[in-house]
Amino acid sequence: MRFVIVTGMSGAGKSSVLKMLEDSSYFCVDNLPIPFIMKFARLAVKESANITKVALGIDIRSGQALEELGKVLEDVKSAGYQYEILFLEASTEILVKRYKETRRMHPLSGTGRVDKGIELERRKLRFLKERADYIIDTSRLLVRELKTEIDNIFVQDGTYRNFFITVLSFGFKYGLPNDADLVFDVRFLQNPYYVPKLKSKTGNEPEVRDFVLSLEQAEEFLTKLMDMLLFLIPNYIAEGKNQLVIGIGCTGGRHRSVTLANEITKRLSATEYGVKAEHRDVEKG
């Protein structure tokens, strides 16, 4: 029997993940009182002929009982029941935005600020995150991308490295991306904006792509950058990092940075790491 505990930050997607698992024939229970977990594990094993996949949702709503969870999980493991913990994470900025969009109160914020409740929850759940077998940061994931990750881990039994890369193109004229871990300035390349037939196009279109990638400096930059990234990424993983945002900036964020972000994403896709491209400013004038 596969026994998965789904937990993490409120607003990070736990309910969505439980629904995805339920759609994949998991027997799902959300917010089961912590003292009942051992009984639940025993019952699930007893019914394993009929129930082969189980998912249990646990979150901050467990209140004071959450402090007992560590001991309960140790007891479950000591009794011979194997489980996996999936921890769903997201940045404070994204969680605040999600709460504002849904007009819901954070369970720990009371009548105060949402961000204060989020930081308190983050501290209370730190011990669970440290125990997690899988950590997924949903800050930049679309629902379908999250489903792909869940299917890979819990449905198709694929491998998962707890690490996801976003290659983000942007325009310096609109400011630096707040969440970028690494930023590279590609304004040293010839600008397609000043080529009349390319001015109105973007780096997503083949004419601009061909122009940028035909530049000798572009290929040299890509080669050196890939060498550096393939050195850095395993070391980031070794230090416990689970996501990397690589900012690629040009003047307006429409031509050079878009092409190079797409090309870097393509080259990283040939490795074992999960990666996607985002273009922050491509639609801006």
Curated annotation (Swiss-Prot):
Query: Which GO terms label this protein's molecular function in UniProt?
Result: ATP binding; GTP binding
Query: Any idea which positions bind GTP?
Result: 59-62
Which Pfam families does the record associate with it? PapZ_C, RapZ-like_N
- Where on this chain does ATP bind? 8-15
Q: Identify the InterPro entries for this entry.
A: P-loop_NTPase, RapZ-like, RapZ-like_N, RapZ_C
Domain of life the protein comes from:
Bacteria
Q: Which UniProt keywords apply?
A: ATP-binding, GTP-binding, Nucleotide-binding
Family note: Belongs to the RapZ-like family.
Question: Which HAMAP family does the UniProt record give?
Answer: RapZ_like
Function summary: Displays ATPase and GTPase activities.
Task: Output this protein's name.
Answer: Nucleotide-binding protein Cphy_0331
Gene source species: Lachnoclostridium phytofermentans (strain ATCC 700394 / DSM 18823 / ISDg)
